[in-house]
Structure formats: C-alpha cells, structure tokens
C-alpha cells in the first residue's frame, strides 16, 4: 500500500476518453430504463434420494427449473440411481416477475404422473447471495402448504350503524378485489375462490366468493359485511372508533382455495389482517403476500429427502438510454489499438473480474457488433504465445484469448453447426443403435463387433461432414484462424505442425467435439438424449478430438490407456484421415475461404412444439388448440403436424406485420402470442413464459426490416364478432394499442449493445477493489523496479505500468459517471414501491 502514494507523482492524470460526449444532465428518470433479468448456472447432481420401499430401490430421476410453479427447463432422465449426476448448464432470459426460483426433483413414471421427490425453493431476493457458488441445497417436502405463492388485494372499511332496536354498532366492510400470481395446479391455472372470515375469541363468521375459472390472476371484486359487537360500556361520546379491547381480539382471515369438483379443495394460501389497522383510519387498502398455514406440515425432515448441488448466477440489469454508455463503449472499442494490449480496458476487464466468463460474453458481443473482435483476439492471442514455451501446449489453457474465441464460435457458428452436424446427429439420436465397445459396460445381448461397426460408421460420417464443411465456415472464424496460424508459425518456426494445432485446438476441441457431446446446448436437438445415446455421443466426440489432433502431429499416439479405445482408434490411422484434417484446416484458415455468397439456403433459427389456435374459428374450446411442430428460418415460419412431416401452413417472413403478446383473458390461456401477417392472425401458445419470450424475440428480430410493419395492434383476440380489448365490431379496425418498439435495422440479430455495455459496467462495479489493487501495482512498478513486495501484484499482467495506470483512471472516471443515473433510478424505484403496493406487498400481519 505504501507504493500507491509516490505512484501519483510518477504517473500523470488520464485524459478524458476522446470522441465521446457527455449526456445532458436532464431528468433521465423520464426516459425509459429497461429492467432485464437472466439466469445461468449448472445443475450438478442429487445425492441420497429416498429409495423405493420394494426390492428395486433405484429411481429414474430428472430435475426441472421453475419460476414459481411454471416449468421453464428440464434435464435429461438419469436411470436407476439414488444419486443422479445431471451436469447440465442452463441459461435463459426471465421475462416476468417472480417470487421463487425452484428446482424440483422427479421420479419418472411411465404409466402414471411423475412423482415429485422434493424441491429447492429460493426467494428472488436471496438469489444474489448464492451467485457463482457451488452450493448443496437440502430438498424440501412438497405439499400444498409449501407451494403457496401469490398476493391478494384487499380493502377494509369501518362504518357506524344504528340497529333496529336503536343500539349503535360497527360494520366491517371487506372488499376482496383481486389476486395475482396464484400457484399452478398440476401445471394448469387453478379455479380459485376465497373464504373471508372474521375471527375472534368467541366468533368465526365465514363468507365465500364465487369460483373463478382457469386463472392465476382472478378478479373477484366482491364485498362482504360483518357486524362488530360493541361492549356494554359504549357511549356516543367515545366517537367513531372501535374500542381497544375489541380491536385487539379480532382479525380478518382470507383463505384462497382451488375448487376441486370430486376431491378435497386444495389450499392456496392465506392472509391475516388484524382489525386494529383501522384504529386510526376508517379505511385500509393494500396488497398482501399469501402465507402458508401456521400449522403447516412439519413432520418431514428436509435432510431425509436428499440434496441437490447447484451453481446459480442471477442478474438484473438496469439498461439506461444509449447516450449514457458512449464513454464506456468508446474506451472498450479502442482496446484492439492500444499498445500494449494488456493496457487496454477490455484486457483489464478480464484481469480483474472474479469469474472471467462474466466479462467474456458481453465483451465478445460488443466487440463483434462493432467489427473489433478479430483484431482484439489477435492481439491477446499474441500475448499468450509469448508465454508459451511448449508447442504442444499451444492455446490449451483458459486464457482471455481462448475464452473470447470459444464464445465467438458459439455466437457466430450456430448455423454452421446446424448445416454440418444436425443431419448426422439426428440419425444417431433417432436410430438408438448401441455403440458400446467396452466389454465391461456391455448390455446383455450386445455384440462388441457389431457395436464397433456402428461406432465406426457414425464417426466416419461425422468426420466426413466436418472436413467437407469449410465452405460454410463463417468468415469471422476464418479470419481469426488465419491470424492464429500465422502467429503460431512465427512463434515456433522450426515446428511445421504447430500452425495446424493452433487452429485444431479450437475448431475440433472447443467447437465440434463439444457440440457433438451436448447437441441440445447448441440447439441441434430439441431434447436431451437417453443414456445410451449420451454414451455413443461421448465416444464419437472423443474420437473426433483424437483424429483432429493427430492431423497436426508427426507422431500419432493415443492418450487413452484403455486397450479397447486404442484398438478402435487404429481403424482411423489411415493416411487419408490425416490428409483430410490438414486440408480442412488449410481451407478454414485461409483468407480466401469465405461463406458462399450465392447460397439461397435459409438459415435455421428456431424450432419446437407449441399449440396453435385453428385460424378462422369463432368458438372457444380446447379442440381449437392443436399441438404442432413450429420451425422458423430466415425466410419463413412453418408449422407441421409432427417433427419431420411436411408443412401444413407457411408464413413468409416478409409477410409478418407484427408479433405481440396476447392477453390471457382472450382464451383463458397463459403464454400466448400472436403473429399478425397479411392473411390472418395466428394465435400460438408456448409451453412457458421463457419459451414464449424467446419466440417473440426471434420473430421480431427476423422481421424487423419489413417495410409494412404495423404501428398498432389489438392485445386481445377477435371473437364472436368483436375485439375483446376495444369492443370494435369490424375485424379490420386498426389496433387500439401501440406496437412494441421495433429494433433498429442496423442492429445485428443477437446483440443488444447497450445491455452488453451495462453488463460490463456491472462487472467493473463489482471488481472495483481489484481494480484499485491493479492501480496500486502500476504505481509500485513505476517507483520500484524489480520484484514486487506485495504478493498480489504479481497476479496482474502489466507490461507498461504508465499506460495501464492511465487506462485504469479512465475506467474509474467512466464508471463513476455511470453510477449517478443508476443511483437516481434505484432511489426512484424504491420510493415508488410503497409498502403495501402490488410491487411491494405486505408480508405477514401489520399492527
């Protein structure tokens, strides 16, 4: 710390970032601030699940992720295990508010409904405390009491009444207005009703609302009246006020129930409001959070059900108007031109963040959007090569360069993977042929030689698809591979093979092999494969890695110690495999190898199973909604009776006029959206809110440049001769609500640069202590040459202490200026969320 003081004298103050303008200091609160939520993490494994009571104690388990009770993600089934190992990563945008993020562990049942073993429920406000940590969570028992969620809007009033015999009493008026976010029952919206009770030491008067059908957000708007008995000592002189001894003993209890016609009604939650809230006021109105029963089921011990290992990272970004991000973007975008690159803002970001992955994804997206990624990766890869002494270890570590390039391949290489691997992966996953070649793992009736032939056939087919795909390799990947190859050859001039291994270590090891191993993660398959197929894909992935590596070496040796794998790999030691690998690597690392510009093949964007409402029908009924397989390309949206069948209906992308959400009240169904096109409006129901959001986003982006897009739309359906939203009778009536703001035509499909810059700002904000440490290290190096006394200083890569110090000062200045509008927005948000409002409901009793 002592070195920091003289550093200020040794290093000059950093100038402002050139080419940027300060945003006007107006009222930014009046402009739109986008609040965007996302969740990523990994479900590792469950342990010590309860066994079956019979002789077969094993279970077939899977895990789901739920926003409250809405399932948004499901793992593969792990068969015959009480400690299933899932090891599945997830990432999704969260398009709505929620109370709990829950993980349910199920036992798969073929003949009956899947059995819920237990769950992990984490309150939204507690998610940040678990961020980035591997944590074991105890599974909790599941019953109606543990599933309580939602809130109630309530109004209480106190009136004075004179009875028929002339006595005076008080009348308590209870207005139950609405509920919001009630739990799902068996995955469906419930049929809720409420009981309203006035409870005291000697009374329990109960009344009941009407049942509302198929909704999680019922609008009751029912009023109930209760007489409050007065004590004999009451006189008119005591004014309009309930006496203290009566107030303290009375409370209003509201219980929510799901109406079950044939079985017992299901408890949904309760609230208790003491009548003394009216002590100082004749009325009280507020939202209350539903609570479980006080005497809930406490018999099951959480530890008895097992535990679940998770890693979670929940982010909530407050994205300001674009002009606020100008200085930070300018600082980041000049990073490729900074000499040395280790003194650039982008490189410093990677140095100081706790988890480099948090910085890499937004950084790659931002640089890619502005065509700055290739020179930046080239510069940081060159820095990696300076520290690499062994040619066999080239680009094998998890440096900033390797992580940036890996993320870039995931972003730009999606279509490349689909056209290259999807056909053969579909064949592998749908054929269910056994490829197990380890005698120890063979199933009864399997033949090793037959399995070996199956595996050879698949590996050869995958290999042929890869080495024949160079024409489809994205240009930006080719440009970076070319740079890597040139730098590797320059660094190790006496090794003719290193230029190939520099490219192979990315395209085979970090791209194709990973996609083969986890096709669902790359959107190559709609569902996770079964256990046998997972094993087949693992063997194929390992073999492809080895062959790709062999093509870059003079000596071809297997790393596998198992003789069965070594014997199998001998089948691929023909010279043609090595020649094909080198030819492929030559083609994708040449500056002349670009994407074919004349291809008319549409880009496959998204597919999945959803429900659509029959077009042209006027009756409301379940049979009007049919399950269909939807497929979106860059040219058209189609739906099919089943996956792989011919299209039943096609909507050209150029004919899409708008894509908007549809109000739940239209068909009493959640997660609906509408595709408005030139012929008719197509109503679609997604399986959950995350899926609906992804489809809406992708459809909006692919049709964003259509010249005939609508400026307004109807948020409800046209049924029985009128629009449900505005009651207009003509189907051609212009929309009654403005369309969602469109995306500017110059923004690339997958990149929201303001959000990516906001993410980078958040990473810098969370890493300020380490940034300060790096600044002190620069000062120490400038003053004291040689080994540094502070051990933490050696962890930083500082080639030019003066240049690095100046950049750090610019970063700190830019972050401080961004802090101001963020703090103003947070204060405004917290002050507007009054306790008892819908956004901030009352929890428990108030007095």
UniProtKB/Swiss-Prot annotation:
Tissue: Widely expressed. Higher expression in brain, placenta, and kidney.
Stretches assigned to the PH domain: 603-704
Pfam family, one: PH
Residues where N-acetylalanine is found: 2
Domain Ras-GAP: 371-588
Principal localisation: membrane
Modified residues (Phosphoserine): 554
Matching InterPro entries: C2_dom, C2_domain_sf, PH-like_dom_sf, PH_domain, Ras_GTPase, RASA2_PH, RasGAP_CS, RasGAP_dom
Protein function: Inhibitory regulator of the Ras-cyclic AMP pathway. May bind inositol tetrakisphosphate (IP4) and phospholipids.
UniProt-recorded name of the protein: Ras GTPase-activating protein 2
